[in-house]
Amino acid sequence: MCIDASSDDIKRFMMPRPAEYTETNQRIIPINYGKIAAAALDPIEKKPLRRYKRGSMILSVGSFGCNLSCPFCQNHRISMTDAGHSVTKDVNPYQLLDAAKEARSAGNIGVAFTYNEPLIGYEYVLDCAKLIKNAGMDVVLVTNGCICEDPLKELLPYVDAMNIDLKAFNAGFYKRIGGDFETVKRTIELSQQACHVELTTLIIPGENDSPDEMRAEAEWIASLNKDIPLHISRFFPAYDYAHKTATDVRTIYELVDIARGSLNYVYTGNC
């Protein structure tokens, strides 16, 4: 997608907290377009997607950067870096499609955009998704859900499944990491109407681990659809929270029990 460089609306159009763009001959181009920092053929359950084409493999790719600043980031080596500090390979949309097709012999069903925040590379994801979908293969997003409504609606027809991070169920938490709680909720609402959606909440001791917060989260998810799977994952010390203590396994199971009071499919993660 190219937008006139004189437009004041480009950043507001894309995300509440925008990605980086560069200007070339009055064309706005994201600096990470086609820059692949990580790629692997993964089990789809690893995304995690537990109730979508179980047993399948999917070509998983990621670039660099993120539109949030989570001090607990579990994948900070690529998500919390920039173009000047990333080792990447240029892969255009047609090359990615070819790679996905070649991996069919190993059980590949499509492409998952993951590892970093894929939607800061929105234009690349959209261009690739159209080709992949047209080839009869699956498109999966693993995202924090921080994207404005209009570009999300443009992308959703080409997406088959998503895992969306619901990092906490309070606005203050999102404000601290540079996000917007209501935007993420709206992304979940729209996405679950258009494709298969699963959610993940990483439980951090003392920050989003209260029973009342999990109860409110599960009840809200159930108000959309009781069959939306929720993954409640254990935090391990990482990045700026390397000094923290890992989440007690008992806490995870207690929160899972609470969530199961409202939802049909609740899973533990990292336990």
Question: Model segments located where?
Answer:
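N-terminal [4Fe-4S]-dependent radical SAM core
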Residues: 1-62, 76-80
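Generic secondary-structure boundary/loop-capping signal
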Residues: 15-16, 26, 33, 38, ...
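Generic structural motif
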Residues: 23-24, 66, 204, 235
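Short active-site-adjacent helix-start/loop capping segments
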Residues: 27-28, 68-70, 121-122
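Short, conserved glycine- and acidic-residue-centered signature motifs
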Residues: 54, 89, 180, 248, ...
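Glycine-rich active-site/cofactor-binding loop and its immediate structural neighborhood
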Residues: 54-64, 68-103
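Conserved AdoMet/S-adenosylmethionine-binding subsite of the radical SAM
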Residues: 93-247, 255
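A C-terminal junction/extension of Radical SAM enzymes
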Residues: 236, 246-271
